[in-house]
Amino acid sequence: MHTVMSGRSRIAGLEVYVPPARLDTDAVEQRIVESSPGFRIPKGLISRVTGIRSRSVMAESEQASDLAVNAAAKVLASCGLQAPDVDLLVFASASQDMVEPATAHIAAAKLGLSCPVMDVKNACNSFLNGLEVADSLIASRRYGRVLVVTGESPSRAVRWSVPDFATFASSFPGYTMSDGGAAVLLEASEGATADSEPSSPAAEGILGMAFIAKSIHWPVGTLAAGGSAFPRDPEASYFTMDGEKLKDAFLDLGSDVLGETLEALKLNWQDFAVVCVHQVSAPYREIFAERAGVPRDLLVPAVEEFGNLASVSLPLQLKLALDGGRCGPGDLVALVGLAGGVSLGIAVVRL
């Protein structure tokens, strides 16, 4: 475990972009059946297992970078900033436009930025790790203002034609996924000091972050195409996952890091306005919250209407909570990320 006592960077702006095209779960099941001669699934199965009713789908002309850029343009406008005001761009996403160059370059070009850029990738924890990198660089005074963006395009990796139930089961995660983008502007906080007590209103910004991983479980879920292992294999271009093994992997990982982080910061869950937890399905959100001791009334339900947005899930939930009046300036919020590989992370933030 690694906990960073920070307070040196704050969230100056947050925006999310959800493509307008929607695909409900009935239509997903119908497309699977139409694309898979001789294969049938019980009607309503996906909804019953996941609780997901709808998800967003990017346009054929859009790329992952476009989703990030849409959100980034909104956050710069809302903060009254121009391209020269950004010191660093971090593209932090499980998705990418291509292997080379880094998608951060493509996003920067579309935004008209001329600052340094980098990609950060760690499955569904990519955005949370992007915040970690940005916060650390701001704390080191290398950069004063960092734009962290993500664009997730999982709809491009869904297997629609399945020959049998085993293939359907291993491809199941793709049927929960959704496209979207998000952007957070982090900047040095003038109102906080590194030694401010987290419980003090003066402790503004990112107060602490912690991450753990059990990388022995990496084969449980993969999208293997595009690397040296499967450079040209079309079969490797789809999501594959063993749901039961993934559940066991997260049980092995545990959630002690969450309690340890709160203890280090002298906080408990009741101190928070909301707790945003990465949501792969509605049932697993409830199971994880119960095991982690997170009160249900602090959660931000999102997966039912928006699907599994990968690394966009956490910023989307925070945006929903802000827009819905559930949190605001001075409030404590927690971002709890889970990701394939497997890893678990938490960021504690005072808005």
Regions found by a protein language model. Name each.
Residues 1-60, 163-248, 256, 351:
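Condensing-enzyme catalytic core mediating Claisen C-C bond formation in acyl metabolism
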Residues 8-10, 88, 144-148, 332-335:
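Short glycine-aspartate micro-motif
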Residues 15, 92, 121, 146-152, ...:
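Short beta-strand segments
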Residues 23, 100-102, 132, 157-162, ...:
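Short acidic, glycine/serine/threonine-rich loops at helix termini
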Residues 39-48, 98-112, 150-163, 226-233, ...:
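Acidic-glycine-rich active-site phosphate/pyrophosphate-binding loop
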Residues 65, 69-72, 95-96, 106-139, ...:
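Claisen-condensing/thiolase-fold acyl-transfer catalytic domains that form or cleave C-C bonds
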Residues 84-92, 270-278:
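Short glycine-rich phosphate-binding loop at a beta-alpha junction
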Residues 139-178:
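Flexible, glycine-rich active-site loops centered on histidine and acidic residues
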